[in-house]
């Protein structure tokens, strides 16, 4: 990517969800035995005493809704007109109309991809349905081809079941992915992105649009929010040791789940793409989803 294009990217195509999203989570260091292109990113929610801090993540997710429900072009116009409050209400209404049970997980994955991998959203499932993935993000790498990150997010009663389902989705969906030049027509770009962003995307992603178009590499990102209660025995431990003991329990659970699904995981070797896996445990992921939706309905009122 030429120097002038790198400057355009840094100035005109930033991720909308910034690093404060990550303040709701703690990354857990773990050495899990997967292939070199299968990257496990294991996080837990921040704590409030010896409980997960659902209030903090709930508040931050509300801030993320406009970036999930509205196009970049709409958001830019709102900022220019200083009408972000009105835009947030509109975004909440749009979000509540989405019937997919995975929409909160999709938004969490968008937060990780934008704040952790610095990969802005290109399109969502509601804008383009490409092979059954929930959306795509674009990651601009210095001196490398652009990466297109196809994302899918799920909730599950157990991590083991979630991993099995995610593998099934990848193996069915990846062969069906369509090329970007057939998906990103002029109408889509002009409707959803500013003029500067349209030029950047077309010149980098669509072959033949510019002399320095390199095409892109496919990459995958999976989010699984799953149930893993904080064990009662842990809450009677010393407060200073509690976080590390909790993480040991979570990591052990992940190791056991991945070992249990080892044969299925091995099937992914045929997929020629890096896969980023984001795993986050909840006490009750369905309860968290339901309570967050109810809080949004109150915001709307």
Positions of PLM-derived features:
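Extended, charged low-complexity segments
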Residues: 234-301
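A structured, charge-rich N-terminal accessory region that forms the first stable segment of a protein
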Residues: 2-83
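Loop-centered beta-sheet repeat module
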Residues: 120-183
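Short acidic, S/G/P-rich loop/turn micro-motifs used as interaction or catalytic elements
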Residues: 156-159, 228-233, 285
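Short amphipathic alpha-helical segments
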Residues: 53, 57, 101-109, 158, ...
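Acidic, metal/cofactor-coordinating or nucleic-acid-engaging core segments within structured domains
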Residues: 101, 164-259
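A short, surface-exposed helix-loop junction/capping segment
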Residues: 80-98
